[in-house]
Amino acid sequence: MKVTDLTVAIIGDNPVVRIVTDADLCGYGAAESFKPYLKPHILYYKPFLLGQDPRDVERVMLGIRHRGAFKPWGSAVSAIEMALWDLAGKAAGTTRPPAIGW
């Protein structure tokens, strides 16, 4: 499974991340409320994410953190991580990520 797209929609004032894969699965994550200005910060990571395996959340997040993931971008990175965990859970056929284990 590989990431084929990353999009951000501003719903109200809330950035909502959508990560799409070649397996027709989508993962969703959201940043903090009232931070629509995070959209370009989230999209900054798109070139890195394309082609990555979203089920390997820890490895992907390590790569993101090497590209800069601290303030003011922390919320942007968290939204991406939420979407990756959402995908990991869907790929495992469950509503929870497999790493949680319950």
Predicted regions and their residues:
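Flexible hinge/switch segments at interdomain interfaces of large molecular machines
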Residues: 99-102
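Structured beta-strand/loop patches that form or line metal/cofactor-binding pockets in enzymes
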Residues: 1-29
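Metal- or metallocofactor-binding catalytic centers and their adjacent structured scaffolds
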Residues: 20-95
